[in-house]
Amino acid sequence: MKIKNVVVIGSGTMGSGIAAHLCNANVPVTLLDLKTEISEKARERIHKSRPPLLIDKSKINNIKVGNISDDFDVVKDADWIVEAVVERIDIKHQIYDKIFKARKDGAIVSSNTSSIPIKVLSEHLSDIEKKDFCITHFFNPVRYMGLLEIVKNENNDLNKINQLKEFCEIELGKGAIVCNDTPGFLGNRVGVYAMQVAMTEAFKMKLSI
């Protein structure tokens, strides 16, 4: 599997960050949102971002923009479709329905959710669709945070998951780890626990802020 073309759906902080980082890796990417104007504003934010999301700002126009009503046909040519919309399960399910009707056979579909279980996200997908569906949880800001969690489901083609992991490590420079579908995945699960331990110890020691 070769990833030569990516579509990111959702141009908020995470979606635009993912699109920018793909652009940094010279991977053709299209950023879609409800309206083209929203995607265009996201591209402007990428161009003006501090710290910069782009290594070379002259590449900004390599990020194509569009909307999910008029430009959804771009999905059919994508090797990887990343969903990065608001954390509402009903909206994500609607997006997946559109994606799986439009995508080419074998194209990877992933969600950037930070906490919704993959079992919930994929509950309306067929076993064949689940084979190509996973979670790719990037951390913010995408360019500077090294960790990437890839959460698999029980139907995944593990060879394809490993190829995606390799792409993200080699082409995107990420420290990619494959996780099971557990609450908080790995990063948030460990991070929240560490913060709670720190707060508990601070209370015990009667530390002030």
Question: What positions do the PLM features span?
Answer:
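Amphipathic alpha-helical segments at domain termini/boundaries
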Residues: 19-26, 57-80, 165-173, 179-184
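Helical "substrate-binding/catalytic lid" subdomain
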Residues: 169, 180-209
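Short beta-alpha connecting loops at secondary-structure transitions
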Residues: 31-36, 148-152, 182, 200
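NAD(P)+-binding Rossmann beta1-loop-alpha1 motif at the extreme N-terminus of oxidoreductases
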Residues: 1-49, 102
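Rossmann-like NAD(P)-binding element
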Residues: 34-41, 52-109, 115-120, 148
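Structural motif
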Residues: 9, 17, 66, 84, ...
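Rossmann-fold dinucleotide-binding core
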Residues: 107-189
